Amino acid sequence: MKRGKEKSSEGPLVSIVCTNYNKGTWIRDAIEGFLQQETDFPYEILIIDDSSSDNSPDIIKEFAENYPDKIRAFYNTKNLGITKTWIKVCKEANGKYIARCDGDDYWVDNEKLKKQVALLESSQGSLWCSTDFDIILPDGTKTHTSALENGIMVRATSYENLLATKGFTMASTWVVATNLMLEVNDAIDTGAIDDTFNIQLELFYRTKLTYLPEATTVYRVGHESDSHPADTIKAKQRNDRLLETQLEYIDKYRDKVDFVELSKQSMTASTNLEAMLLDERSNLLQANITIRQQQELLDELDSRIKEIQDSKRYKLAGAMAYPMAYLKRVKGRFR
């Protein structure tokens, strides 16, 4: 197991690493969150754009020019994909630790780095720290707070647990020892469909995860991204590739895998999924009952409307046939 770089009296303790591809709508939020960090140690910000076709490069350039002592920007001349781009920019890090945040997410705790670094510096067996997070939609609407603590997302806790559940540690909350991150980057498949899944497995294999149960970060969902394909075919392809990765990693570190624990985790995940499907089935049945009841009410209302319309037609026909008698009857109502 490798330790991170020794702390330099001159260089940064932490390298914030941000990857971006067509996140022009949100990248400004991410960068401002980096700049607002309150620490008692120096840190640097590395931002790499993967040949975006939107205004992302212009925004990144603006910040880099305004904060030349803090921000270093990199621009791919052709699109490499998230995994290769991540590996490439990590090699530029000068800090003892790497803090990841993707361009569509952002930090909301100004002491995020300070808290996580303190945990890692005092730890004897952990080189990796993550936190809880909130969830928002592309338009900024918050859908969930403290997603892990409130059980909205499954929190990954170990190698076996992650293999069985495809759980979450939320990459944009990570702080990892740089040397360990570089070692892991050398071990992952550069063609991975989701680099964070492979990275998490490699990290869990090598170190313990320190978890801070505070929502320091906002995770943006509901838009097209590598981890959330909008197209159903792409989504299925992603799930198939993730299954391939799960099977690959069962064999890759077979000598270290606790298969009893893996079986327990798999059975638990399967049971939880069945419970969720039963709930969904119950909700669908109830929805069908409600729809049927509403349709019956609509049919009854439609029938009443027709009766009223027929009655009005009858009265109108009578008025036209016997106008004087009809007028006398109406006039008599107002005496």
Report the location of each language-model feature.
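Short, acidic, metal-binding catalytic loop of nucleotide-sugar glycosyltransferases
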Residues: 32-42
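Cell-envelope/extracellular polymer assembly enzymes that use nucleotide-activated donors
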Residues: 12-15, 44, 198
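Short aromatic/hydrophobic "clamp" motif used to bind/position activated sugar donors
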Residues: 98
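A conserved acidic beta->alpha catalytic loop
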Residues: 49-58, 78, 102
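Conserved donor NDP-sugar-binding/catalytic core segment of glycosyltransferases
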Residues: 111-144
